[in-house]
């Protein structure tokens, strides 16, 4: 029997976990790549530290074994690093770490898995509204998410004719642990973020997961940037 496999990074919580559970509910085998384990019955956990550029040498065989026999692979680059930094303060080491997690690791996974990805497979990048705009205090994140959109567009062009499609889903402010860790416990800040969207609320991880699923299964959106942000209020 042919197998469809979701390979997803950072699925121990938030958007990643919601996505993994959604695919699993539809019969997909799920392989999670993260340092923290995934709470998903039947899920395959690969404890790879994507912030270490040398992970390929030690763990590539384990990853390839986890997708053996897959007729279709949906690769979802979800893991992300969000830091508090700015142009006057950001040093090379911290920028390099953000780029490693948010851009370089996805390309490492692309190169490793593409030889075993057949027609009908997909690569979905999880970007951010900040992939096409900027706010103060998140320089490394803004830079890396802009670069991720470029990587998606290059993926579309370089894989033309192979039957593998790609897209970049750019969530707005989503109610995740990462967002709450970044802004702190100030409910007023969270309220302000919610007020920046036309529905007046934060996005749920499940809503983004549904968008990722749609992009993974529909090749017509190949090369597209898909904004999942409830509509932003322009001020």
Predicted segment positions?
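Active-site helix of classical SDR
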Residues: 110, 144, 152
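N-terminal Rossmann NAD(P)H-binding glycine-rich loop of SDR-like oxidoreductase domains
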Residues: 12, 20
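Substrate-binding pocket helix/loop in short-chain dehydrogenase/reductase
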Residues: 86-87, 91-97, 193
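Alpha-helical segment proximal to the catalytic Tyr-Lys
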Residues: 115, 157-158
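C-terminal substrate-recognition "lid" of short-chain dehydrogenase/reductases
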Residues: 201-228
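Residue(s) in the substrate-gating loop at a strand-loop-helix junction
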Residues: 128
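Conserved NAD(P)H cofactor-binding loop of Rossmann-fold oxidoreductase domains
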Residues: 78-83, 231
């Amino acid at each position: 029997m042919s197998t469809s496999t979701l390979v997803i990074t950072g699925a121990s919580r938030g958007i990643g976990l919601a996505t993994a559970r959604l695919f699993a509910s539809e019969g997909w085998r799920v392989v999670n790549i993260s340092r923290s384990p995934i709470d998903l019955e039947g899920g395959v956990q690969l404890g790879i530290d994507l912030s270490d550029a040398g992970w390929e040498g030690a763990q590539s065989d384990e990853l390839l074994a986890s997708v053996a026999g897959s007729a279709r692979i949906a690769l979802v680059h979800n893991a992300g690093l969000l830091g508090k930094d700015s142009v006057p303060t950001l040093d090379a080491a911290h920028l390099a770490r953000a780029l490693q997690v948010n851009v370089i690791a996805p390309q490492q996974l692309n190169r490793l898995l593409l030889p075993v990805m057949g027609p009908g497979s997909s690569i979905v990048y999880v970007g951010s509204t900040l992939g096409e705009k900027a706010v103060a205090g998140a320089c490394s994140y803004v830079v890396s998410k802009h670069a991720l959109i470029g990587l998606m567009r290059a993926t579309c062009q370089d894989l033309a004719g192979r039957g593998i499609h790609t897209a970049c889903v750019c969530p707005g402010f989503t109610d995740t642990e990462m967002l709450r860790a970044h802004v702190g416990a100030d409910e007023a800040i969270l309220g302000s973020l919610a007020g920046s969207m036309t529905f007046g609320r934060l996005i749920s991880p499940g809503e983004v997961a549904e968008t990722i699923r749609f992009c993974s299964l529909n090749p017509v959106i190949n090369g597209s940037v898909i904004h999942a942000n409830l509509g932003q209020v322009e001020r």
